[in-house]
Amino acid sequence: MSQKTLFTKSALAVAVALISTQAWSAGFQLNEFSSSGLGRAYSGEGAIADDAGNVSRNPALITMFDRPTFSAGAVYIDPDVNISGTSPSGRSLKADNIAPTAWVPNMHFVAPINDQFGWGASITSNYGLATEFNDTYAGGSVGGTTDLETMNLNLSGAYRLNNAWSFGLGFNAIYARAKIERFAGDLGQLVAGQIMQSPAGQTPQGQALAATANGIDSNTKIAHLNGNQWGFGWNAGILYELDKNNRYALTYRSEVKIDFKGNYSSDLNRAFNNYGLPIPTATGGATQSGYLTLNLPEMWEVSGYNRVDPQWAIHYSLAYTSWSQFQQLKATSTSGDTLFQKHEGFKDAYRIALGTTYYYDDNWTFRTGIAFDDSPVPAQNRSISIPDQDRFWLSAGTTYAFNKDASVDVGVSYMHGQSVKINEGPYQFESEGKAWLFGTNFNYAF
């Protein structure tokens, strides 16, 4: 793995999951901010106001609440992501269950001030990622451990103009932290072969270096990076109520700029730096600083909610994320030298969701939904630490109201991803993945 690839993953460390470490939407984006939303595949979230969690999606929904309302819960993610392939050295690249299970907690509060104004706060996550490979994995130079977390703190307010129009605005503070490790795997053998096939292989120095590379143990830590940082952004929403049974929403979440600082080290001998080899910059075990600016993409979403019958409603969403803003990563040292400059070339991506809700009685509500996540990662830029792919959702859930004040939500989703091929460094992989998501939230209106 090159130092470019290492810092690609370090950048993503600045955009990952709140006390969680999974990305189960397109790219490294997270949707899991409520359990009621999970049960309908997050369809119509900008226009539904059945609990306080919806306000984190559209702050204009604050005006739909006439009492202070609280919601807290978590979504449990149980992924099954497997990698297969064969290294040029002949070693197997098979690895099962590379994405660990994780919890994605959430907490929301909404309070009206008067008939026109209200405010809300939430703790969620919008980005997340985690993959883990064995320390002796043959492709350890591009696999290893990627443990990335973020927490999004949101404070928002809303204004009702009249019976039809409401507007909301929110401020977001994102805290991110990361730990990334890469191991030699069989890269030493491959590098030794590359040296011997180059002009350097005809010199005594080159031959000695090739022998050193060939002797590198597979569990040698060739790269280590950790760090943390804050980033800031904003979100806004508009709600239009045609009548009490039909409403529509437009929401926006801004691009977030995060200036990431991390500590980088490698146990490789510095002599490897003189040959332009496809390995991380060697530091001989010493630690140095690396700086990187990452722009997390903006997102637009259009949502609708129609109660077509006293007991039935349909809801739907179309989200558009400007992943094309994520075109390159450039890391520099303290002295300003370029540590890497890598073209990412992500493309804009969309998410479409459709669901329905059945209001059985005053106690029971049932919901279901389907969704499709379009992957923003071009085939040539896929990575086994971010094995992204198009994904299909199938969801169901229920709410039980104990009384007019307290209720509990339960949701479950099955997510299936298509099988994809990944070309990274000297390796060729195949990846397939699926996941089960289970969530529960408790809601209380004061």
Swiss-Prot record:
Keywords attached to this entry: Cell outer membrane, Lipid transport, Membrane, Signal, Transmembrane, Transmembrane beta strand, Transport
Cysteine pairings via disulfide bonds: none
Primary location group: membrane
Keyword Transmembrane attached: yes
Compartments it resides in: Cell outer membrane
Membrane topology, record value: Multi-pass membrane protein
Protein name: Long-chain fatty acid transport protein
Record function comment: Involved in translocation of long-chain fatty acids across the outer membrane. FadL may form a specific channel.
Family the UniProt entry places it in: Belongs to the OmpP1/FadL family.
GO annotations of cellular component type: cell outer membrane
Molecular function in Gene Ontology: long-chain fatty acid transporting porin activity
Signal peptide: 1-25
InterPro entries from the UniProt entry: OMPP1/FadL/TodX
